UniProtKB/Swiss-Prot annotation:
The lineage of its organism: Bacteria, Pseudomonadati, Campylobacterota, Epsilonproteobacteria, Campylobacterales. This is Crossover junction endodeoxyribonuclease RuvC. It catalyses: Endonucleolytic cleavage at a junction such as a reciprocal single-stranded crossover between two homologous DNA duplexes (Holliday junction). CDD domains: RuvC. Pfam families: RuvC (PF02075). It comes from Helicobacter pylori (strain G27). One of its GO terms (molecular function) is magnesium ion binding. It comes from the Bacteria. InterPro entries: RNaseH-like_sf (IPR012337), RNaseH_sf (IPR036397), X-over_junc_endoDNase_Mg_BS (IPR020563), X-over_junc_endoDNase_RuvC (IPR002176).
Amino acid sequence: MRILGIDPGSRKCGYAIISHASNKLSLITAGFINITTTRLQEQILDLIEALDCLLDRYEVNEVAIEDIFFAYNPKSVIKLAQFRGALSLKILERIGNFSEYTPLQVKKALTGNGKAAKEQVAFMVKRLLNITSEIKPLDISDAIAVAITHAQRLKLH
């Protein structure tokens, strides 16, 4: 089974695809979609086109998205919600469903502590997947963590 984990952002959208087979997790690919255009419509289109390419290329079975966190800037939250809405619609069209996890759920699943720092989550991602190189930016390790969290939830059900 292939799981796509997404950490949506207003400038960078982290993604990771992991394989979950025979109780073993392995990283297939990870990166981020850089959102560089200035018009919102173009940003959404760029994001959706990149998602389409990932879904086509890697034959994803499951998708998990990190939920919106609390932010002090209402404009950022609204923009992020628009991106998530567009991502959600495309995923529903292509896959049929998706799961959502809060940052607290992801941190707790990987570290046992819902208030863990991003660096602790990145450390556990590397440890669980036997990754020796540095994972930068942290949007990528967050996306991997979302995918791992979903794989753990699937094992429980």
